[in-house]
């Protein structure tokens, strides 16, 4: 009984009870073992009420802690195992993640490259069947052939872009150099203060080349003569107006013959221009394209001959100037 009253023995008793309850495999066995120990605990509380209560509270607290740890131990164990497995898996995987998988480079032979280049020159976008045929010829896989054509097209596009950039830097290229003239040759420089003083002279205009006038073989300064009536017509009208004043002693028959000669010498003019009623005010004739130099010289020579012939006739026949009433009449006596 003395050992039961001793507090140390009571604590040992509670600890033993705790161990028994915690080590039980099932709830039924733990409840039965605790149930068997309850009379001893009741006796200990009856013998030493103050110390037994404190020891009982401590034992109950330990029992609760042990039961909670027992119930949560499988889940905690699983969590700990999963965390340990993750850490073990992450250990060897970290270096593999850091290191990228290296690509396998294909080393083509010269024969394979020749075959691929020849096919690329014919067709830059081969279809699946063509790629398979090339793969059979070159002893390569279809994927390798497809990748080679993709890289080759990218290189070709880059080269085309570089060539276009060089053409833009050098101007419009060699094919446009003959069409575009330098700026200085097209527009000679003038100072801003000398525009009014210099002006455009006939010499500067004659030095310039006009392709339109060159094709017509006409000087640009003489272009006015193209759109004005020929000098031969005006000279002929002037000469015809001067005929009565020059030949005053010629009778009416002589004037008629002169008009007839003019009509015979210029049939084209008579068909185009009607004979005027008054020779002093002839109407302006329509435009007729003629060679101005040749026609004017020929008409002047013809008229000079006509004037000379009529002048001699008037000198040789002075009696022709007399009228009918001026002749002497012999009256019979």
Curated annotation (Swiss-Prot):
Short sequence motif Nuclear localization signal: positions:
301-305
Q: Which gene encodes it?
A: PITX2
Q: Under the cellular component aspect of Gene Ontology, which terms does the record hold?
A: cytoplasm; nucleus
Q: Keywords for this entry?
A: Cytoplasm, Developmental protein, DNA-binding, Homeobox, Nucleus
Residue ranges of the DNA-binding region? 101-160
Top-level taxon in the UniProt lineage: Eukaryota
GO MF, any single term: DNA-binding transcription factor activity, RNA polymerase II-specific
- Role this protein plays: May play a role in myoblast differentiation. May be involved in the establishment of left-right asymmetry in the developing embryo. May play a role in vasculogenesis during avian embryogenesis.
A Gene Ontology biological process noted in the UniProt record is: positive regulation of myoblast proliferation
Principal localization?
nucleus
Motif OAR in this chain:
295-308
In which residue ranges is the amino acid composition biased (Basic residues)? 97-106
What is the protein's given name? Pituitary homeobox 2
Give me the ranges of the annotated region Disordered: 1-115
Q: Can you say where in the cell this protein is located? A: Nucleus; Cytoplasm
Protein family (similarity comment): Belongs to the paired homeobox family. Bicoid subfamily.
InterPro entries, alphabetized: HD, Homeobox_CS, Homeobox_Pitx/unc30, Homeodomain-like_sf, OAR_dom
Compositionally biased intervals (Basic and acidic residues): 58-67, 76-89
Classification via SMART domains: HOX
Q: Which organism is it from?
A: Gallus gallus (Chicken)
Please note every region of biased composition (Low complexity): 22-33
């Amino acid at each position: 009984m003395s050992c039961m009253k001793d507090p140390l023995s009571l604590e040992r008793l509670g600890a033993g009870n705790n161990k028994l309850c915690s080590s039980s495999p099932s709830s039924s066995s733990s409840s039965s073992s605790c149930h068997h120990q309850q009379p001893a605990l009741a006796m200990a509380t009856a013998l030493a009420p103050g110390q037994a209560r404190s020891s009982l509270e401590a034992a109950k607290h330990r029992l609760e802690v042990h039961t909670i740890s027992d119930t949560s131990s499988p889940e905690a164990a699983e969590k700990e195992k999963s965390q340990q497995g993750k850490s073990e898996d992450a250990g060897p995987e970290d270096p593999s993640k850091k290191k990228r998988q290296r690509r396998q480079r294909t080393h083509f032979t010269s024969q394979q490259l020749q075959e691929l280049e020849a096919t690329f020159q014919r067709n830059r976008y081969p279809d699946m069947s063509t790629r398979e045929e090339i793969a059979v010829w070159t002893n390569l896989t279809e994927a390798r052939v497809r990748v080679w054509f993709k890289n080759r097209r990218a290189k070709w596009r880059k080269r085309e872009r570089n060539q276009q950039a060089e053409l833009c830097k050098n101007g419009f290229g060699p094919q446009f150099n003959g069409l575009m003239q330098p700026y200085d040759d097209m527009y000679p420089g003038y100072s801003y203060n000398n525009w009014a003083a210099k002006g455009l002279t006939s010499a500067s205009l004659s030095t310039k080349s006009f392709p339109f006038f060159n094709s017509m073989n006409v000087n640009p300064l003489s272009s006015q003569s193209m759109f004005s009536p020929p000098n031969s017509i005006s000279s002929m009208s002037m000469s015809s107006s001067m005929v009565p004043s020059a030949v005053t002693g010629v009778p009416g028959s002589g004037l008629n013959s002169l008009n007839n000669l003019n009509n015979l010498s210029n049939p084209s003019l008579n068909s185009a221009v009607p004979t005027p009623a008054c020779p002093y005010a002839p109407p302006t004739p329509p435009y007729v394209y003629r060679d101005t130099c040749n026609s004017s010289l020929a008409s002047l020579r013809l008229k000079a001959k006509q004037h000379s012939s009529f002048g001699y006739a008037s000198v040789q026949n002075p009696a022709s100037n007399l009228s009918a009433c001026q002749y002497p009449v012999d009256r019979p006596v």
